[in-house]
Amino acid sequence: MKFKTGDKVRVMRGKDAGKEGQITKVLKDADKVVVEGINMIKKHQKPNNANPQGGIIDKEAPIHVSNVMLLDPDTNKPTRIGSEVKDGNKVRIAKKSGTAIDK
């Protein structure tokens, strides 16, 4: 998985295509990511200590990694992700501009 928590991504397919957000959670086993404010669903919540009223809450649902692309830190356009070894460390790079994503 080439995505990490905190990466800025753009949704390329689906009902939220074109929207941008930050990754809040990475689900490696399912190849999915949770993006802040994207792919919102309504969940019926039973009453509990945290929410004694219960009811319907809005929540972000995971989206498959094939439907999102990382935003290039320089150009702010969608780009693919590559990797290079610099100073003995593996670093993610943006394919379009060649700049390092991990600082």
Swiss-Prot record:
InterPro entries: KOW, Rib_uL2_dom2, Ribosomal_uL24, Ribosomal_uL24_CS, Ribosomal_uL24_KOW, Translation_prot_SH3-like_sf. The keyword Transport does not apply. Keywords: Ribonucleoprotein, Ribosomal protein, RNA-binding, rRNA-binding. GO terms for biological process: translation. One of its GO terms (cellular component) is ribosome. Pfam families: KOW, ribosomal_L24. One of its GO terms (molecular function) is rRNA binding. Gene3D superfamilies: 2.30.30.30. It comes from the Bacteria. One of two assembly initiator proteins, it binds directly to the 5'-end of the 23S rRNA, where it nucleates assembly of the 50S subunit. One of the proteins that surrounds the polypeptide exit tunnel on the outside of the subunit. Belongs to the universal ribosomal protein uL24 family. PANTHER family: MITOCHONDRIAL RIBOSOMAL PROTEIN L24 (PTHR12903). This is Large ribosomal subunit protein uL24. The gene is rplX.
